[in-house]
UniProtKB/Swiss-Prot annotation:
One cellular-component annotation, GO: cytoplasm
Protein name, as recorded: DNA-binding protein 7
Entries under Pfam families matching the protein: 7kD_DNA_binding (PF02294)
Taxonomic classification: Archaea, Thermoproteota, Thermoprotei, Sulfolobales, Sulfolobaceae
Cell location: Cytoplasm
Organism annotation: Metallosphaera sedula (strain ATCC 51363 / DSM 5348 / JCM 9185 / NBRC 15509 / TH2)
Assembly and binders: Monomer.
InterPro entries linked to this entry: Chromo-like_dom_sf (IPR016197), DNA-bd_7a-e_arc (IPR003212)
Role: Can constrain negative DNA supercoils. May be involved in maintaining the integrity of the genome at high temperature.
Length: 62
């Protein structure tokens, strides 16, 4: 089963498959990321403590 990242963006609860994540970086205690949203670039952020290990392992990698 693929890992899903659950996060809030502009008041909406969203979920994205980790395979769609493009770039991951850390801002303070938050982990920010961009992902492929059907041809558009989506953005999201999740707290470091709530982030899946797979996402944390992607920090700084392309």
């Amino acid at each position: 089963m693929a890992t899903k990242i659950k996060f809030k963006y502009k008041g909406q609860d969203l979920e994205v498959d980790i395979s769609k994540v493009k770039k991951v970086w850390k801002v303070g205690k938050m982990v920010s990321f961009t992902y492929d949203d059907n041809g558009k670039t989506g953005r999201g952020a999740v707290s470091e403590k709530d982030a899946p290990k797979e996402l944390l392992n992607m920090i700084g990698k392309k």
